[in-house]
Swiss-Prot record:
ATP binds at G105, K106, G107, G108, V109, G110, K111, S112. Keywords: ATP-binding, Hydrolase, Iron, Iron-sulfur, Metal-binding, Nucleotide-binding. Homodimer. GO terms for biological process: iron-sulfur cluster assembly. It comes from the Bacteria. One of its GO terms (molecular function) is 4 iron, 4 sulfur cluster binding. The keyword Manganese does not apply. This is Iron-sulfur cluster carrier protein. The gene is mrp.
Length: 368
């Protein structure tokens, strides 16, 4: 007749997976019950690995069969599987009420021009506004804001930077931190760290809105910003031509995947009015955006004409909302700022700005 000693001796032949000691020596055998031809075993192991449990179950069952056990009740207890940490909202700029991402699927569509004039138009509404030039590979904001020759200012501790002021807007750009014309040849991690530092190591103070001029595309910079602060709005800048609209769709798709509320689309350079004959020409075509608007449940936030004064203002550091406040484009930026402000109020009321669902998670599990 089978005894507990017989069972223990058989269990001493069961080596714990990936180790050299048996499960009896480890102290994993917690209980043995014998009743007629039935055997009950309670084994407790420190691993939550399903593979480890399966190996032990197979080896123990085989050993007990060889001992003549006909009915085996084998209970292998394991610790709970490690749970991924619950995602939480991350915010490196808690003094800023709203962060707005100005994006484009491609370069050369007027993204920086939009960022500059929108920022000033928001400031003209008596809001505290910051403008962050996150386009580290092509920082045009210093020139467009008339700051290309300005020196950066350190705070008394010498550890943080104070934004420069222009037209009522607090401004910071990588273009202020290295020589004009110097190229940056950075890999993704360096770019990501730079964007985080421009949020945490700049003394922005209490802002109502921070407008962020992004690099073109949908890469590391956009993901880093979205994970670093809850974004209240995403704005895509495009031109009416089909290839630009294709890229605008990618930008809108990025907003959707990163849970960024979409404020709308800015259609830039939609038409040109000749100053001499007053004839209007659609240089880039007049392709409809209705499919984009419907697919992403958004609106055209502004339709800007191709106005020479806009380009001249950017080159001279005199944005059109300042140099020609009564121009067609300036009035459009003014209306755009009002509409964006209303959108941001809705985002705040409905608590739509949250980045907890896009935070990186990492789970560590012991397999032995």
């Amino acid at each position: 007749m089978l005894t507990q000693e017989d069972v223990l001796n058989a269990l001493k032949t069961i080596i714990y997976p990936n180790f050299e000691k048996d499960i009896v020596s480890f102290g994993f055998v917690k209980n043995i019950t014998l009743h007629d031809d039935q055997l009950g075993l309670l084994i407790e192991i420190p691993s939550s690995s399903e593979e480890t449990s399966a190996i032990l179950r197979e080896n123990i069952s085989k050993a007990m069969q060889e001992k003549g056990v006909k009915a085996l009740n084998l209970d292998i207890k394991t610790p709970p599987k490690p749970q991924a940490p619950k995602p939480t909202t991350k915010n490196l700029a808690k003094n800023i009420k709203h962060v707005v991402m100005i994006s484009s699927g491609k370069g050369g569509v007027g993204k920086s021009t939009t960022s500059v004039n929108l920022s000033i138009a928001l400031a003209n509404l008596n809001q505290k506004v910051g403008l962050l030039d996150a386009d580290v590979y092509g920082p045009n904001i210093p020139r467009m804001m008339g700051l290309q020759s300005a020196d950066v200012i350190m705070d008394p501790s010498g550890k943080k930077l104070i934004p420069l002021k222009a037209f009522g807007v607090s401004v910071m750009s990588m273009g202020l931190l290295y020589d004009e014309g110097q190229s940056l040849i950075w890999r993704g991690p360096m770019l990501m760290r730079a964007i985080e530092q421009m949020l945490s190591d700049i003394i922005w103070g209490d802002l109502d809105v921070l407008v962020v001029d992004m690099p073109p595309g949908t890469g590391d910079a956009q993901l880093t910003l979205a994970q670093a602060v809850p974004l209240s709005a995403g704005i895509t800048v495009t031109t009416p031509q089909i290839v630009s609209l294709d890229d605008a769709k990618r930008s809108l798709d990025m907003f959707k995947k990163l849970h960024i509320p979409i404020a709308g689309i800015v259609e830039n350079m939609g038409s040109f009015v000749c100053e001499h004959c007053k004839k209007e020409s659609e240089i880039f075509g007049s392709n409809s955006m209705s499919e984009l608007l419907e697919a992403y449940h958004t609106q055209i936030l502004a339709k800007l004409p191709l106005e020479p004064k806009v380009r001249l203002g950017g080159d001279r550091g005199e944005p059109i909302v300042i140099s020609h406040p009564n121009s067609v484009s300036a009035k459009i930026f003014e209306k755009m700022a009002q509409d964006l402000s209303a959108f941001l109020e809705r985002v705040k009321k409905e608590k739509l700005a949250d980045n907890k669902d896009i935070q990186p998670t990492q789970t560590h599990a012991c397999s032995h």
